[in-house]
UniProtKB/Swiss-Prot annotation:
This is Aminomethyltransferase. Keywords: Aminotransferase, Transferase. It comes from Xanthomonas euvesicatoria pv. vesicatoria (strain 85-10). It is an enzyme of class 2 (transferase). The glycine cleavage system catalyzes the degradation of glycine. GO terms for cellular component: cytosol; glycine cleavage complex.
Length: 369
């Protein structure tokens, strides 16, 4: 049974091409994926991300629970509304999901987890939470809209209750606040995103989502679909769960070493495997690659290295760069001489640092200059 977000009819009325995405009927584009991509890089676009799962955790021991559940350290979260990106691991160090955790109060934290992993995540979190007496509450009453781009914040702030505009303007990156729109809609406003641009991800009651979406349209925010979301996030060097990492891949093998907090001696699920890989080195590595020849890099293509074979993970044609870019997982070792097998032809690749694009501009070295 395909699920629909509260905005489904709204997307169709706007001419969206709808596709199945992890069991959800979602817009891939509203006419031109390319235009939507550039709209976000240059001004502001909005995405329906109501398929994402919001999970509220309540209890006196919720911080202690999250110190055990997550590979990054919630002890970094000391101010209400502050957020942290982290992986949730299995005992083998594999990534069950990547998520954002928000500190609300000492007995209330909020998680935003991926749509495709919802059932698995809820079961795992529930199993681990039981001995900490933490109550796990899925918030299916919420919708979620991401407004992204250099003009995004101004356009959203114009819709807020005037009493809250100053606080919203000062909100730092990876922080959130509870606010209201001019029309009295309760909004959880987070300065986060999945595009590499500034902006907000807004959690709000389902029954208010259509009205707020239409208010954003009136502000000149253009709708954007999952197609543009994918090219934007890959340019920004952001992983997609299920494609760039999964239960059989550790954060060290997924370019996510920066999300691991080993230094404080905290015991968390998967720690022993990560300690071993940090000391001995992980057997595989995730790298960014650019193909200067014409063509497109696709998931599953074989990558040839001096140390053995790897594969393309996320791959796309980058609208900002005008070249094919990708993540690849390859054996540990040299990444000097790289080639990709495209229908039997070996095509050279360049390994580059990611993000490929920051603030709408190619990062140094990405274009080969």
């Amino acid at each position: 049974m395909t699920q629909k977000t509260i905005l489904n009819d709204t997307h169709r009325a706007l001419g969206a091409k709808m596709v199945d995405f992890g069991g959800w009927d979602m817009p891939i584009h509203y006419g031109s994926q390319l235009d939507e991509h550039h709209q976000v890089r240059r001004d502001a676009g909005m995405f329906d991300v109501s398929h994402m799962t919001v999970v509220d955790l309540h209890g006196a021991r919720v911080r202690e629970f999250l110190r055990y559940l997550l590979a990054n350290s919630v002890d970094k979260l000391k101010v209400s509304g502050k957020a942290l990106y982290t992986c949730m691991l299995n005992p083998q160090g594999g990534v069950i999901d990547d998520l954002i955790v928000y500190y609300m109060t000492e007995d209330f934290f909020r998680l935003v987890v991926n749509a495709a992993t919802r059932e698995k995540d809820l079961q795992w979190i529930g199993e681990q939470a039981a001995r900490f007496d933490v109550r796990v509450e899925e918030r299916s009453d919420f919708a979620m809209i991401a407004v992204q781009g250099p003009g995004a914040r101004t356009k959203v702030i114009d819709l807020l209750d005037p009493a809250d505009t100053a606080a919203a303007s000062k909100l730092g990156r990876f922080a959130a606040l509870q606010t209201r729109s001019r029309d009295g809609i309760d909004l959880f406003l987070a300065r986060t995103g999945y595009t590499g641009e500034d902006g907000f991800e807004i959690v709000l009651p389902q029954e208010a989502a259509v009205a707020f979406w239409n208010a954003l349209l009136a502000q000149g925010v253009k709708p954007a679909g999952l197609g543009a979301r994918d090219t934007l996030r890959l340019e920004a060097g952001m992983n997609l769960y299920g494609q760039d990492m999964d239960d059989g891949v550790t954060p060290y093998e997924a370019g996510l070493a920066w999300t691991i907090a080993l230094d404080e001696g905290r015991d968390f699920i998967g720690r022993s495997v990560l300690e071993y890989q940090k000391a001995q080195g992980a057997p595989r590595q995730l790298i960014g690659v650019v193909m200067d020849e014409k063509g497109v890099l696709r998931h599953g293509q074989t990558v040839l290295t001096a140390s053995g074979e790897g594969e393309i993970l996320s791959g796309t044609f980058s609208p900002t760069l005008g070249k094919a870019i990708a993540f690849a997982r390859v054996p540990a070792g040299s990444i000097e001489q790289l080639r990709v097998d495209i229908r039997g032809k070996q095509v050279p690749l360049r390994a580059v640092k990611f993000p490929f694009v920051r603030d709408g501009q190619a990062q140094p070295g990405v274009l080969g200059d």
